Amino acid sequence: MSKLPFLSRAAFARITTPIARGLLRVGLTPDVVTILGTTASVAGALTLFPMGKLFAGACVVWFFVLFDMLDGAMARERGGGTRFGAVLDATCDRISDGAVFCGLLWWIAFHMRDRPLVIATLICLVTSQVISYIKARAEASGLRGDGGFIERPERLIIVLTGAGVSDFPFVPWPPALSVGMWLLAVASVITCVQRLHTVWTSPGAIDRMAIPGKGDR
């Protein structure tokens, strides 16, 4: 979860726990909720953002991102999740994040025609995946790879706020998208460096590895 107090697990638990119990009673599983939330989030991002409906797209994506958090609450109510569920949730998060940046990239590239902003968006798209991969690959090797400025909640807050404010009804501020995207791009690159440094300083990180055989590749 985020380091921000108002995005803490405890803060959301007050809202999500009763809803999670209700969903479990009607027979839904955490994995089904994960897939439904991701599907809706991706559909909203890839439909509304390319049409230039940035405020509506930001609201839809944010709603279903919050909806997707119900799967964790449901798993806790059932006494714990499964390893497959954890992998599915992480995979769907990457798909959802990718859809957000791809939808915005389409609008920026083909309608705004802002080349510098295209570059910033591409940086955000790539680093959003790399940040998560560094942690996953490090933990698979028994090392630490967490921390850094930007985690998923902060990433979504920055990009969705920038998109929404740039197209806000009645009082839009168009530069907000560019400001948010460049801020996120810089912070994301720094986070990649921070996480790599965390991996490098982990115990055993520079120990030599056995050379894999042909059958291991």
UniProtKB/Swiss-Prot annotation:
Underlying gene: pgsA1
Predominant subcellular localization, coarse grouping: membrane
Protein name: Phosphatidylinositol phosphate synthase
Source organism of the structure: Mycobacterium tuberculosis (strain ATCC 25618 / H37Rv)
Transmembrane feature ranges: 30-48, 54-77, 83-110, 115-140, 152-166, 176-200
Function: Catalyzes the conjugation of the 1'-hydroxyl group of D-myo-inositol-3-phosphate (also named L-myo-inositol-1-phosphate) with a lipid tail of cytidine diphosphate diacylglycerol (CDP-DAG), forming phosphatidylinositol phosphate (PIP) and CMP. PIP is a precursor of phosphatidylinositol (PI) which is an essential lipid for mycobacteria required for formation of their cell wall.
EC number(s) from the headed UniProt entry: 2.7.8.-
Annotated Pfam families: CDP-OH_P_transf
InterPro entries: CDP-OH_P_trans (IPR000462), CDP-OH_PTrfase_TM_dom (IPR043130), CDP_ALCOHOL_P_TRANSF_CS (IPR048254), PIP_synthase_PgsA1 (IPR044268)
Documented effect of changing Y133F: No change in catalytic activity
Effect of Y133E: Almost loss of catalytic activity
Recorded topology in the membrane: Multi-pass membrane protein
Single GO MF annotation: CDP-diacylglycerol-inositol 3-phosphatidyltransferase activity
Assembly and binders: Homodimer.
